[in-house]
């Protein structure tokens, strides 16, 4: 991947971090924040959403474009959701626990709490909110975090309700689940102080660490999302939404910089060619006898083929902007927003069953010369007309520069067009929820995870890697409780982190293990009733039989700690079976026999004891 001189390009970037809070109930109702499976839904309903005007009488451009594609939104409701999520009951008062958690997060970011928090409605008509808006309130502003490339300012901290979970995209709409809708969410927006991809990732990691330090945020896939705003000099601000992994942020910034650089180069080339976009038209007759599967299928279903001539665009529609994404892909993104399956263009034709003769006839039909390109859409008449018009408009933009827009992050670091950038016209007051006066004086400062790592190393003599695993893990409180109860710190840490990870890799259902299971197992080791080596086997058995008592199950499995005479008997048996090897190698046979001894004892004996006895028996025979 090309690495640019970001200072020379004038890279400016900012982050929006969206993190679910781990509260018992949702932000504006008493429903639990428990996630559900779609199959558990007990009812469904549908909605059609349309944009509304802001308090200034304006309609947001992003919402307006969304409304041009009429779609049916179906929602899955559960016995753990209510009429508030369905927008059939007014919202309740703002959840106090969520507000307290948000204030604590703001404190860690060095922010100033607002004197009064007013709830607003943010227009969102993509179906992810049943009422066509998301409730949001500013809790704090100002603040900063440190990075190795300088400080990054924090603009604002919003407390919001999470959107509904997108379950299935359909031809005429989307299926959503209400279990996620209304979960409290904080949105942290940085100032545009980020000047490199590496700094963007570092800033996100720092904010993520601060969030997890509170112990009041949800963990797991989908509970945190990052949006990245990127622009370069002469380019435009582009918002990329839905980055799930911190590992993707720097690649995403690099690819967006590359995209904007390529688009600016295309602007210069089009200007030099005196390019122009022609008028879209129906070219169905050109393909009356086509054998192209896509086009033939559309025509057989009563569809049409529409085309737009792109004068001076020859060779540029196929120009790569990002990895495996071209200017033509950008055109296609806009066409698919209006229901088309995609586009064909002459930079890639003849292909896909379209013949050279059909390409020549197409050029003649729209008046395109050798230096021109042509894009086509084959679909039902209305979709084809709307989609090719969208392509024409995006081509016009390509001659002017980089468009401001919202894009969706792809897994490979590239992005795709979603909609225009939203503006202030999407906000208006929520009159059903009274304002609240935050009290920052009650906020306590939690220990940062980085500080916890250092303490674990100093107080418990854990190595840096293990200390970090425990501190950043889900069971650090259990770890501290067990150490206080007398369990060896290294054993407790390895059991709660390393052993669980190994069992998960072996497809053991470790999600069934509870704190009580771990307390029971570690207690058996501390009392001398279970060898450390038997811990993995007992935990695996408990995961399969979560209702079992650890002590009883250990006895059933024969994992009770072996006495020294039992250990010696097992070791002597191994040594005598391998007497020739012992006679020939002496202590050189130790490693091979140690493994056999541990296998014979099946985890019932501590490794140090087995090692000591084995050394004695080998030395006696050497």
Curated annotation (Swiss-Prot):
It comes from the Archaea. The keyword Ligase applies. GO terms for cellular component: cytoplasm. Belongs to the GatB/GatE family. GatE subfamily. Keywords: ATP-binding, Ligase, Nucleotide-binding, Protein biosynthesis. Its EC number is 6.3.5.-. Gene3D superfamilies: 1.10.10.410, GAD-like domain, GatB domain, N-terminal subdomain. Pfam families: GAD (PF02938), GatB_N (PF02934), GatB_Yqey (PF02637). SMART domains: GatB_Yqey. This is Glutamyl-tRNA(Gln) amidotransferase subunit E. GO terms for biological process: glutaminyl-tRNAGln biosynthesis via transamidation; translation. It catalyses: L-glutamyl-tRNA(Gln) + L-glutamine + ATP + H2O = L-glutaminyl-tRNA(Gln) + L-glutamate + ADP + phosphate + H(+). Heterodimer of GatD and GatE.
